[in-house]
Amino acid sequence: MALSVEEKAQIVNEYKQAEGDTGSPEVQVALLTANINKLQGHFKANGKDHHSRRGLIRMVNQRRKLLDYLKGKDTTRYSALIGRLGLRR
């Protein structure tokens, strides 16, 4: 259920801060959000897949940590990112 190479490249191009940027918090959060959304669809069809649910919870926690970091560093970038991604924080 991982993202394809094309999907990752599209997300990186959309959220990058500079050319060649793949590690900024915005890119990482956007990739995690796409993976989380894809896994949520998987759980609608496979409700008893507890092994994958653990991975989902890990991704959600990692995204939360990155968002907390970004909020502490630059609140304007944080606000813009959650607005673009449609997160409810």
Curated annotation (Swiss-Prot):
Source taxon at top rank: Bacteria
GO MF entry, a single one: rRNA binding
A Pfam family hit: Ribosomal_S15
GO BP: translation
Record SMART domains: Ribosomal_S15 (SM01387)
Assembly and oligomerization: Part of the 30S ribosomal subunit. Forms a bridge to the 50S subunit in the 70S ribosome, contacting the 23S rRNA.
Protein name per UniProt: Small ribosomal subunit protein uS15
Organism: Ectopseudomonas mendocina (strain ymp) (Pseudomonas mendocina)
Phylogenetic placement of the source organism: Bacteria, Pseudomonadati, Pseudomonadota, Gammaproteobacteria, Pseudomonadales
Gene name for this UniProt entry: rpsO
